[in-house]
């Protein structure tokens, strides 16, 4: 293939109840930071990720203790569980048997062909996919010897090698990631991969850094990739609470119109005209809407003169003035509210719009099932 395979044209792959690929949705993932064998801590963290909007979660499986915990974890969570395996095919078999919704392996590094065959056979029987995880930092020696250092071509060659191992065993429920910590390398690798095969792509800039630096780096790299129509699922990798990964992912997808059920905040950068504590209000509203699963655009603006006009596209918003605020919908002023209650009034209006959306969705669902 010489053209980029758009995300809508990729091969659909089921992960639990979700479909990755074959549509325009980009599914948000994260990874638990807990020791997987600590079931209570792992489940608690996954529950926080679920609440933040994470749709798929991955856990490490470095040993038998971790593998033995998978079944208990799976029973207590509501989103698909991916198990990350390196080298030991027996751990992959245990994870599959325990109910993993997907496993992440590189077929070429778990041993002889019969070991790969055993994993593929188990995955087929359970109907679960395999993610091939190519990483610029851990390319095979023969590829590094060939190219001299990690390159996009080398990463694609590695991916195709692992894909062929699975395809030769008549296994096609495959998702591929092409991660690198270098932004330009990642962009090039994903673009070349999207031209080389039509399997769904899991996006990520690996080892991107701390909350601030990693957010900027991930947004720069993944934004460029998403803008090419590439990517079916993604994880923002941060040295931070994984809930922050989900928040950043949601904001990134919203920026490209790829998050259908997420609220968006518009807020002004402030200037000498503002008469309210806009920064703290904007932060409070942003936190409030972070878990709302409805396509609501909310505005928080500091100037009552220009505010409503500037946020004409917002569903609901407030513009501050001295001692009061203007509450408006679609750019039209609804009413004036006292400054001390304007945030609470805004929250009430947000809730109303969200409830209207939920009711509409339920009605459409009922009609479709009738």
Swiss-Prot record:
Which Pfam families does this one have? GcpE
Q: Name a single GO biological process.
A: terpenoid biosynthetic process
User: Quick one: which pathway?
Assistant: Isoprenoid biosynthesis; isopentenyl diphosphate biosynthesis via DXP pathway; isopentenyl diphosphate from 1-deoxy-D-xylulose 5-phosphate: step 5/6
Write out the coiled-coil annotation as residue ranges: none
Molecular-function annotations in GO: 4 iron, 4 sulfur cluster binding; 4-hydroxy-3-methylbut-2-en-1-yl diphosphate synthase activity (ferredoxin); 4-hydroxy-3-methylbut-2-enyl-diphosphate synthase activity (flavodoxin); iron ion binding
Q: Which family does it belong to?
A: Belongs to the IspG family.
Under HAMAP family, the record lists:
IspG
Name of this protein: 4-hydroxy-3-methylbut-2-en-1-yl diphosphate synthase (flavodoxin)
Please tell me the species this chain comes from: Bacillus pumilus (strain SAFR-032)
Please spell out the taxonomic lineage of the organism that makes this protein.
Answer: Bacteria, Bacillati, Bacillota, Bacilli, Bacillales
